[in-house]
């Protein structure tokens, strides 16, 4: 019976994929309930690698390759002893590590090291067809560099211990050797500071330090909309304004706004809608200006209408970010549960969707860093991690200082079912939920959420215990404690979701709920939809 259940779920899930892109948030230490800095990243893609590895420290003097496109089909399970850069990876350069590197968590976009430096990225697009983008297109076509986002984040995590060090490192590499790829917005945090870094193309980049009481958001469009001369809180490529004038990217009139000069015109709902939703959801001085004004999700002047960042009235928790990332525009005119694509049971994980939300079915993984600067490095380097759509996944604690990850982290491909893969384990729950999402999401929450709440408290207690052990000279024992605890939690979730996928599929067999009738989520609205479609057929 188990094989039959899994076969059905695999077919449903593979058929439900489509293309999208990432959402990131960053929160300063004075805006969080526990005094940590936070970053988050929903890695939304049809094709990204689902495996997660620990990359160990490399000794000083080790040669490091600079690889472009080194992800598809690559295997970093034995790196650096075995260098497998996959089917598309090309080594463009190499350098010698002048000092021992940091251990870090390697993913499609690597995200935290054992110093507690954390990252998240959002690939930024612009209006390629617009006339005003013509100078940018011409400039981009002539700009070739060797650093793509995958490699730059890997190298920054290997070499930097603080957010400022990471910004300096990334900026120097782009200045010296150039950027390879679409523009990117990268949030970087270390428990004390948060920086927002944007790479545009060629040798152009800039970054600013987020105020400690602020919340930053980005949904696939460049956002740094102001300019300062280099200072303690703002950094940029040398001669950035002069370059923009010389190339015709800027005419010298008005404010110099990097996001508009180098990546202008991305005003699609797919991006602006997600930004608007954050301002609606988290109360701040800006909320009254946007709440109830659904038309602002199509705003064509977002850099003027929306703030670059804001101070939330209530302190942010890991759960706050998880809820935002699970959002489907509920309660607005863009409510995904009321889309005809969602069917009678409000399946927001259907494809296609009418309005692109933050929560999407093709999310590869979802991570929230939660770095507390007052803890020792070994105990502070915490990230909450889960595979799949944020609304249906769990979050399990991972420490970049661990000696090993649970086995299901490093196996599997989305193209072939693997019962030992963490991604497939969650994907089956997600897919079963699409059979009756309105009911399934409540079942998932009832099982998951109490465990998550208890896990937050238990994890902080474990961190404090590890900190005491390190203070008493028991560093190795503390790392063993963190490893044992984190892997126990990961295995607990893996087993729980293995059972949950079968329970959900059995619950919705033959289109019912435990063999009882299942009413539509929005009964009257759904009747209108069906009637309208029926009328068209006539």
Name each model-derived stretch.
Residues 1-4:
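Positively charged n-region of N-terminal signal peptides that target proteins for export
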Residues 153-159:
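Short, well-ordered beta-strand elements within core beta-sheets of diverse protein domains
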Residues 448-538:
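Histidine-centered catalytic/metal-binding microenvironments
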Residues 159-167:
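Short, charged, surface-exposed loops that flank catalytic or proteolytic processing sites
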Residues 339-471:
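Substrate-recognition/cap regions that form aromatic- and gly/pro-loop-enriched pockets
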Residues 22-149, 169-308:
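A contiguous strand-loop segment
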Residues 7-16:
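Bacterial N-terminal signal peptides
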Residues 245-374, 378-382:
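Glycine-rich, aromatic-lined ligand/substrate-binding cores of catalytic
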